[in-house]
Amino acid sequence: MNQADRALQASQARVYNFSAGPAVLPLEVLEQAKEEMVSWHGSGMSVMEMSHRGREFENILAAAFSDLRQLLAVPDNYEILFLQGGAIAENAIVPLNLMRRLSADAPKADYVVTGTWSVKSQQEARKYGEVNIAATSETERFHKIPDVSSWKLSSDAAYVHLCTNETIVGVEYQETPDVGQAHGRVVVSDVSSHILSRPIDWNGYQVLYGGAQKNIGPAGLTIAIVRKDLLGHAHPLCPSAFNWRLVAENGSMYNTPPTYAIYIAGLVFQWIKRQGGVEALETRNIIKSKMLYDFIDASSFYRNEIHPTCRSRMNVPFFLNDESRSEAFLAQARERGLVQLKGHKSVGGMRASIYNAMPLEGVEALVDFMREFERVSA
């Protein structure tokens, strides 16, 4: 049986997984990992068994760095860091590395709050200095991103923090916000749930970070991309393993990195290149999300509450107008091989996370089911 036949056989037993994270991975990647599980490239070792200092893993790591830089067109004056702890840890790591950049005596940062994750980010940052809420959409239930013209930014803030795709509520910045980066303002963004889904304007962001478990690979790996001149401002009490400068100087191996998660991420990077790169995936993601939103908008049975100008391409929350039918919807969806559609407990309803690895056929199957469920429920 050749690789294509094995992939076809495996696909026939798989479901369409709409989990928000950990999330669906490309089947090709899983098949390759399966083939290489016991002996990577004839080494006689699984990647999980390799020394992170050995030649084999050094090759894996170097390829992952190189491919990610190429895919996102990361400029040479930015450092790519492979870390651990997820975006939750970065909520502390960011202020520990940046908040004292302008003033050690009066550390300060601006935060734009557009959903659950940016709420958590600003709460954590308050442990390390003053936080100014430059804008928030909380009074609108986070259904819309505040217009940039309304943001109240501080002249003495070390950085502006955003979450450019809020996984739970389903809002996404569709444009890079212009907040004066050309005049020295530093913009930091949590991109956990939409990294590699669209190109990045590096004039607009000086630090990006995200957990890998949504759009890159398995849980355990965190990626930060930091402009090099922003390294070296860490708080004296910042743990060494979370000091961006030390991590950069040690090639992301100051401590033992999450080797297998990096290996899988590297396979995903190669898969993205075979798909035509980030630009090709963006086109595909627009098609997938438009298909789902168009169906919801045309229906009197389902609804999406997010303002059309900032709907997420990755995370599509929706509700049944008759919410008493929600459990039946989920149960029948599972019977059709459509899983992990339940919305976050803080929001309710449903949520379809349609990351890069979700094929168009998965979204088509979901829409077909939603149409049929609406018909029989009418």
UniProtKB/Swiss-Prot annotation:
Binding residues annotated for L-glutamate, in chain numbering: R53
MF term (GO), any: O-phospho-L-serine:2-oxoglutarate aminotransferase activity
Positions carrying N6-(pyridoxal phosphate)lysine: K214
Cofactor(s) essential for the protein: pyridoxal 5'-phosphate
Binding site residues for pyridoxal 5'-phosphate: W117, T167, D190, Q213, N255, T256
SUPFAM superfamilies per the UniProt record, alphabetical: PLP-dependent transferases (SSF53383)
Metabolic or biological pathway: Amino-acid biosynthesis; L-serine biosynthesis; L-serine from 3-phospho-D-glycerate: step 2/3; Cofactor biosynthesis; pyridoxine 5'-phosphate biosynthesis; pyridoxine 5'-phosphate from D-erythrose 4-phosphate: step 3/5
GO biological process: L-serine biosynthetic process; pyridoxine biosynthetic process
Subcellular location: Cytoplasm
Cited HAMAP family: SerC_aminotrans_5
Name by which UniProt lists this protein: Phosphoserine aminotransferase
Origin species: Ralstonia pickettii (strain 12J)
